[in-house]
Amino acid sequence: MQSVNEVAQQLFSKLREKKEITAEDIIAIYNVTPSVAYAIFTVLKVMCQQHQGECQAIKRGRKTVIVSKQ
């Protein structure tokens, strides 16, 4: 299995075509537990903070969504 960082990097690359990613998407795509999906999602949020022009994390009700700015 890939590491959390590797999966987050893949999702970061796919974010432009997918436009947004939720923790539920990560569970569905990679068939992982919610705790692993949350860890991947957290790394993805940090990557967005480092590359602020490319994506951002926004709250939608009770959910946080990573949204592409492009």
From Swiss-Prot:
A family per Pfam: F-112
Listed name of the protein: Uncharacterized protein ORF70
Classification via Gene3D superfamilies: F-112 protein-like (1.10.10.1470)
InterPro entries recorded: F-112-like_sf (IPR044877), SSV1_F112-like (IPR018601), WH_DNA-bd_sf (IPR036390)
